Design a protein with these regions (language model features):
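Conserved SAM-binding strand-loop segment of SAM-dependent methyltransferases
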Residues: 1-11
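C-terminal lobe and adjacent flexible extensions of AdoMet/dcAdoMet transferase-like proteins
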Residues: 123-173
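Residues lining hydrophobic/aromatic ligand-binding pockets adjacent to catalytic sites
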Residues: 8, 21, 58
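A short hydrophobic/small-residue beta-strand
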Residues: 52-53, 143
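A short glycine-rich, Lys/Arg-flanked "PGG" loop and its adjoining helix->strand segment in the class I
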Residues: 34-51
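SAM-dependent methyltransferase
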Residues: 53-131
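A short SAM/SAH-binding and catalytic strip from SAM-dependent methyltransferases
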Residues: 16-33
């Protein structure tokens, strides 16, 4: 496993047949310049015909929760018999398509007493279908498939939670 900044990833020219940027991480590149750099770096590491899988949130769905309201995201039991509560709120800058999120982690012990609270500021871009297709084309990729979920369901803009892109390297840049 390699941990590096994907914008400047240098794994050798044409070394791989498959690349994946998991967990919607690509959307954390909020600047178009950074998105282009990342796609070019991935492109460079793939062989001709190599595939790149890039899951993104569906902006039509994801933007609905970027309204500033505090939302519970989940409660999870801990190994010690306690509880982890994850919540957060987010706002969308409609002019840039960037969401600012403040994620809260509350740790409770087995007696339900609050032991710790952590805050994680996050930023991510909501990249629409045509915008990502244009970025991919500019980096030398063609879409092979676009799924609406991780079960490879059909992408329906009005209802699919995700855009799971499968791209193929078609040309050298």
């Amino acid at each position: 496993m390699l941990r590096a900044d994907v914008r400047y990833l240098d794994l050798g020219e044409g070394e791989f047949i498959l690349a994946l940027i998991p967990l919607h991480s690509f959307s954390e590149l909020v600047l178009p310049r950074d998105q282009k750099l990342a796609l070019r770096a991935v492109h460079g590491s793939l062989r001709e015909g190599g595939r790149f899988v890039c899951p993104l949130p569906n902006p039509a769905i994801r933007a609905r929760s970027a309204d500033g309201a505090l939302r519970l995201n989940g409660s999870f039991s801990t190994a010690e018999g306690g509880l982890l509560v994850v919540s957060g709120f987010e706002t969308l800058d409609e002019s840039s398509g960037v969401v600012d999120r403040l994620q809260l982690y509350e740790f409770f012990d087995a007696s339900k007493e609050l032991c710790a609270k952590r805050v994680l500021p996050m930023r991510f871009a909501l990249i629409d279908r045509s915008g990502f297709a244009e970025l991919a084309d500019g980096a030398g990729f063609v879409p092979v498939a676009l799924y609406g979920d991780y079960d490879r369901g059909e992408y329906v803009e009005e209802s699919s939670p995700f855009m799971v892109w499968v791209l193929e390297k078609t040309r050298r840049l």
